[in-house]
Amino acid sequence: MQDENGMIPMGEPDDVDDPAASPDVPPTVKARNAVQQEVSRLLDALAPERAAHRVGTKTNEVERYRTPRGCVLQTTAGAVTVSWFPDSAQGAELGELQVVAWRGTVSHPGSSKRTSGAQLVEEMVLRPGESRMGGMEWRAVDGTTYSTEVLAARCETLLERWTNGGDA
């Protein structure tokens, strides 16, 4: 099973078996903690829990609301919501992240302000997984992968479409 140089082939990166991807093997506590850290990093990038406010400055009229498992980024024309749904401790999955772009005003949890509602424009469902480089990545249903930083930028891009009055 050696090649012409006497080396044992290790296979292609796609051929490597990922035990965490196997539906019968529950994720480890370490994997669950790593995913929770990535969720926190994403939410901190989009809507920090303690945003620094300066008197007299505007943040492009984006209202950022943090929830225990997500955030709402609201402009006058639209919004982007990010929600994390962890799997149970006994489940074989780590959970899923939903990123939804809305036209209109989304009411955030705990708000007494009610509006006419919002229309869903675009939705991405992502699952966490280990990247080939050893870090965490987010995999969309269509196979697209995002690092946490790139996913945060993608959410901001979706929000910009509404801030600038564009259509998704």
Predicted regions mapped to residue ranges:
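Intrinsic disorder/low-complexity polar-acidic segments
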Residues: P68-A168
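Charge-rich, low-complexity N-terminal segments
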Residues: M1-Y65, G70
